[in-house]
Amino acid sequence: MIRIAAAALLAAVVPVVSGAAVPARAAAPHAWVGTWSAAQVTAAATGLSHTGFRDRTVRDIVHTSVGGSELRIRISNAFGTEPLEIADVRVALREKGARTVAGSSHRVTFGGRDAVTIPFGQREFSDAVKLSVSAEQDLAVSIYVKQATGPATWHPAAIATSYYSTPGDHAGAASASAYPDKIFAWYFLDGVDVVNPSVAGAVVTFGASTSNGAGSTRDGNERYLDDLARRVLKLPAGLRMSVLNAGISANQLLAGGGTAGQSALTRFYRDAIEQTGVRAVIIWEGTNDIGVHPDLHPSQLISAYIELIKIAHSYGVAVIGATLQPDQGANYYTAQGNKLRQSVNRWIRDSGAFDAVADFDAVLRNPFDHAEMLPAYDSGDHLHPNNAGYQAIANSINVSTLSFLVSG
């Protein structure tokens, strides 16, 4: 459940906790709002992300959370080692696999130009593309790079299938024949925005592999953020919201590096606060810190949460704190770590520091052993939920409360 600290909702059928006031938020300019996102990391030490691409087209397949009358994309070179030269980009409606709907392909420009060079450490929005898209629609964003990219900025563990081509510019091709190779990651693309004045704003699901949907079915769009997005679509116009992914597998609050991404403290502004139209963030983060360092003191994690809350509130963004799931039986489970998890969860529930609390621990735990995930919700590794577990999490969130935080 979500518990809210807003006086305006005292009459609502949700428990009330104390919490900090959130500054007033300005409307997103021109009604742009994020519909899809993926947090990026540095290239791996080996493999495709390390070698990068030359004279190839990457076809990233993404799934919208809300629709809109036009769109724009954001390409990232945040973790590149040299300028990223993009020669051609197209966006189309995806039909099946790497195939796109005939006639739906649109050229994407940057400042009116077909090509763009993005300095290393930077990212770039495209111009608006007049392509109407629906909620829960698959898009194919095809990015052609002629020159060698060097190590690539990417999102590993996408839990979705994308593609890359044989040599050449195949960005505008509707056929899948030039895309024989599957990749289970998103390269370069880190955001898609749409114009939709009926959407109140965006909710960012920020965290580690559970926020990213590990344990859910590949290509099924059954992460908890997908389930939540489907629920909020049923709200009246003006109260609906998009749901954006800012989860990274193996990510930690306090430490960072490699394909686990920068620490939550380091990446929070880029991956959460800078999302277009963001109004609220659900923070589900800390499990990996505890697993790797069970000797941490609760105050170390609590201080990090407080810092994230301060950052969000300074930009008028509400923060929902999610309790950490039980993980007895997981590879790095320890009794010491479980005590730390319980201490942190008590603070999340009872401190009043968050604007609301999502008690995912209560949803997922075995009622007969609170250190263990309920078997019906366990993906099998005792750490990540399965599809049913993610659906249960999404179902536990009071969407009326969430809508209040987003639109209030």
Predicted regions and their residues:
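Positively charged n-region of N-terminal signal peptides that target proteins for export
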Residues: 1-4
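N-terminal secretory targeting modules
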Residues: 7-206, 216-218, 237, 405-407
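Conserved SGNH/GDSL esterase-like catalytic core that processes O-acyl groups on lipids
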Residues: 36, 54-60, 83, 87, ...
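Short hydrophobic segments within beta-strands
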Residues: 206-207, 322
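Proline-centered loop/turn at the N-terminus of a beta-strand
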Residues: 242, 316-318, 356
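Catalytic His-Asp segment of secreted/periplasmic serine-dependent ester chemistry enzymes
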Residues: 265, 325-408
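Active-site segments of SGNH/GDSL-like serine hydrolases
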Residues: 284-289, 308-342
